[in-house]
């Protein structure tokens, strides 16, 4: 177990940005009631501070970094093996981009427990040792406002620098984070980029988001599927990073989709576990998709939606063979 105390944290630099954060902290953590976020503070950051205060926490508290025991850690990692396999290559590429700046990368589950650590680590620095450990709890409930807790709570990418952390003991850290969604749209965890006493690099939020999307795409492609639809608006790139992906199984049911595909093709509300056929999303027969994948897998297809909007798509065959029994049933229905 590691703990950091406020007196271990040095004052932040006296530039205008840090002075603005300092003024915001005095307003939020003082006795003055605020109806909304103070000037210069993002609404999501103010909400996180408010949640910490509502939980009875104080900024000057000692921060304890609790970790799972060996048995619980083994169970947690075993339960996320597919996520780990998808994330490790992407994290290695990420570290190649930021390692020279002394940033490292963390992968957590949906509760904020660290599953994987990659990058250059100063093992003699207790501030690095405290967080760069598999099994440590970095949730908002555990360690206050961080990119990890905020990304999970807000379901979006964040950047957090020094004194923007709730606890004064955490003001050495700078971190970017983005949530990770599974092929069914559920939150699986988040990807974090953290440095200790490093220059501010808010652009890392975009890198974290890009890498999180790459992990989601790897998870989707690993699903058994008969067709993979690459989706975009007309004129947008296809077959490249940053596109929508929709996987369809051998019977024409949606096996999964990435975040962009769920935005391009909104899915109707349905009961958990209830299959959703692609014909409920796309205003064209499933048989037409199968034929296009067989005959013209590298040729874009105009894809009508029931809303009247149109997308363009590449429809490519997957490793799973199409069920011809279901295909004939759709041809005659």
Where are these regions (language model features)?
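A short beta-strand signature within small-molecule sensing/ligand-binding domains used
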Residues: 170-178, 309-313
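Conserved small/polar residues in nucleotide/adenosyl-binding loops
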Residues: 325-332
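Short beta-strand-to-loop transition segments that serve as allosteric relay/switch motifs
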Residues: 190-199, 318-319
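Regulatory sensory and allosteric helical modules in signal-transduction proteins
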Residues: 66-100, 104-105, 109-163
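PAS-family sensory domains
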Residues: 44, 54, 114-149, 207-209, ...
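Amphipathic alpha-helical "output/dimerization" segments
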Residues: 202-214
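Sensor-regulatory modules in signal-transduction proteins
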Residues: 180-182, 305, 318-320
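Sensory modules in modular signal-transduction proteins
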Residues: 87-106, 221-265
């Amino acid at each position: 177990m590691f703990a950091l105390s406020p007196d271990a944290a040095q004052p932040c630099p006296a530039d205008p940005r840090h002075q603005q954060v300092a003024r915001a902290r005095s307003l939020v953590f003082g006795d003055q009631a605020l109806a909304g976020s103070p000037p210069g503070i993002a609404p999501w950051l103010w909400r996180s501070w408010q949640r910490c205060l509502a939980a009875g926490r104080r900024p000057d508290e000692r921060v304890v970094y609790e970790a799972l025991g060996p048995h619980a850690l083994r169970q947690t990692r075993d339960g996320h093996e597919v996520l780990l396999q998808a994330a490790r290559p992407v994290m290695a590429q990420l570290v190649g981009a930021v390692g020279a700046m002394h940033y490292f990368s963390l992968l957590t589950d949906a509760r904020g427990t660290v599953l994987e650590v990659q990058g250059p680590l100063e093992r003699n620095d207790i501030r690095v040792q405290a967080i760069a450990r598999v099994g440590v709890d970095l949730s908002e409930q555990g360690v206050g406002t961080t990119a990890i807790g905020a990304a999970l709570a807000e379901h979006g990418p964040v950047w957090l620098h020094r004194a923007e952390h709730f606890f004064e003991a955490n003001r050495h850290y700078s971190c970017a984070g983005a949530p990770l969604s599974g092929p069914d749209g559920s939150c699986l965890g988040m990807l974090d980029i953290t440095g200790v006493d490093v220059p501010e690099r808010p652009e890392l939020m975009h890198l974290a988001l890009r890498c999180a999307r790459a992990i989601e795409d790897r998870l989707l492609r690993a699903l058994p599927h008969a067709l993979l639809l690459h989706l975009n608006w007309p004129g947008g790139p296809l077959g490249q990073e940053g596109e929508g992906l929709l996987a369809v199984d051998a019977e024409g049911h949606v096996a999964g989709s990435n975040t962009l595909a769920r935005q391009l093709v909104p899915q109707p509300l349905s009961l958990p576990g209830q299959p959703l056929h692609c014909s409920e999303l796309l205003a064209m027969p499933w048989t037409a998709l199968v034929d296009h994948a067989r005959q013209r897998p590298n040729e874009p297809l105009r894809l009508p939606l029931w809303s009247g909007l149109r997308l363009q798509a590449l429809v490519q065959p997957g490793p799973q063979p199409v069920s011809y029994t279901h295909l004939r049933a759709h041809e005659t229905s």
